[in-house]
C-alpha cells in the first residue's frame, strides 16, 4: 500500500489523521522535530491497523534540509498532510523578532518550501495529493494573536 507523509505529526489533529489513514490501509511517514516522541503512537497504529509506520526527524523551519528530507523518503508518499504549527505569545513576538520570524517560518514559509519540492515531484509523476491543516485563527483574526493568525491565514 502507498505511504502518506504527515508533517507536524505531534499535533493532536495530525495524530487522529494518522490513525484514519492507517485504518484505510495507508503506510505512514510521521515527521516531527522530535520524532522519538511519536514511538507510542507509531506502535499503537502498527498494532491496530497492521501498516508500516516510519518515524522521521524533520524541522520545517530548516529550509536547507527540505530537499534531502524528501529525497530520503523511499518510496515517495502518495499524499502529504502538513499540520505543523507554532504559536508564541503575542507579546513575545512583539518584543523579540526571532519569535515572530519562527512563527512565520513554521506556519507559512516552511510549508511553502517543502510543498514546492513535493508538489513538483507529484506533478511530474501526475499523482498525489496534498492537505494543509491550518487554524481557525487564520480565518478569525484577533488582535490578541495577530502574528500567529496572519501566519496561519497566509
Please identify what each model-predicted range represents.
Residues 85-101, 144:
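Conserved mid-core segment of classical short-chain dehydrogenase/reductases
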Residues 26-40:
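Conserved glycine-rich Rossmann-like NAD(P)H-binding loop of the short-chain dehydrogenase/reductase
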Residues 47-63:
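Rossmann-fold cofactor-recognition segment
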Residues 141-149:
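Active-site loop-to-helix junction immediately N-terminal to the catalytic Tyr of the SDR YXXXK motif
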Residues 10-11:
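Conserved glycine-rich cofactor-binding loop
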Residues 115, 151:
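Active-site helix of classical SDR
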Residues 135:
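Residue(s) in the substrate-gating loop at a strand-loop-helix junction
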Amino acid at each position: 500500500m502507498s505511504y502518506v507523509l504527515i508533517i507536524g505529526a505531534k499535533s493532536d489533529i495530525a495524530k487522529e489523521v494518522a490513525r484514519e489513514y492507517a485504518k484505510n490501509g495507508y503506510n505512514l511517514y510521521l515527521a516531527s522535530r522530535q520524532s522519538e516522541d511519536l514511538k507510542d503512537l507509531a506502535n499503537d497504529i502498527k498494532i491496530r491497523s497492521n501498516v508500516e509506520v516510519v518515524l522521521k526527524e524533520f524541522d520545517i523551519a530548516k529550509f536547507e534540509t527540505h530537499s534531502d528530507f524528501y529525497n530520503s523518503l523511499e518510496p515517495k508518499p502518495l499524499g502529504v498532510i502538513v499540520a505543523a504549527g507554532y504559536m508564541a505569545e503575542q507579546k513575545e513576538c512583539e518584543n523579540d523578532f526571532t519569535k515572530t520570524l519562527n512563527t512565520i517560518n513554521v506556519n507559512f514559509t516552511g510549508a511553502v518550501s517543502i510543498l514546492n519540492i513535493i508538489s513538483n515531484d507529484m506533478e511530474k509523476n501526475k499523482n498525489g495529493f496534498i492537505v494543509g491543516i491550518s487554524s481557525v485563527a487564520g480565518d478569525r483574526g484577533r488582535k490578541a494573536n495577530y502574528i500567529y493568525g496572519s501566519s496561519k491565514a497566509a
